[in-house]
Amino acid sequence: ALSRVYADPENGEITITDPAQSLDLGAVGKGYAADAAAVRLHELGVTCFLLDFGESTMVCAGAPPESGGWTVAVREPDALLNLSGRREVPEYSGTLTLADRCLGVSGDYQKYFASSGTYYAHILEESTLYPARYCRAVCVLAPDAFAADYLSTALFAQPYAAAREAAENLPNVDVLWIFADGSREMTPG
């Protein structure tokens, strides 16, 4: 539980008192690294690029010549989740055209384990510490990868109504939810 995690801001340290517990920075680590790489490319004078940090985090700067942006496919969650433990050939539910935007995707199909025909995803709901099951995936477009990465995880772990309300109050952020029944909801934008 988080009650066993202590932060010391003065020394920049975090202590975990339970040796069986660990912290995973997956919700923000790739976004932070992607932003740092993008800053370095800009410092070197590179203005048009796409950085793909493992399917769930992307930085799209500029646009390829004679295009409106980078075309990025959104995976169909059901095409990837297979309870036998095998990964199927991915299918795509649509594409996005991105220029000077970052994409963060969190889903229950990316990291999980299966037991007795039930799968357990890697993103936990804070109040129960059990896998969140409000939707199958959340895709976030934001000005920076850190925000896109963080927000996709945070919005995934909340009930849809609360997540939608939070998302609609975020400037320059667009969100797509994909639900278990295949339906989709998007913020205006």
Predicted regions located by residue number:
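Mature catalytic core of soluble alpha/beta enzymes
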Residues: 1-189
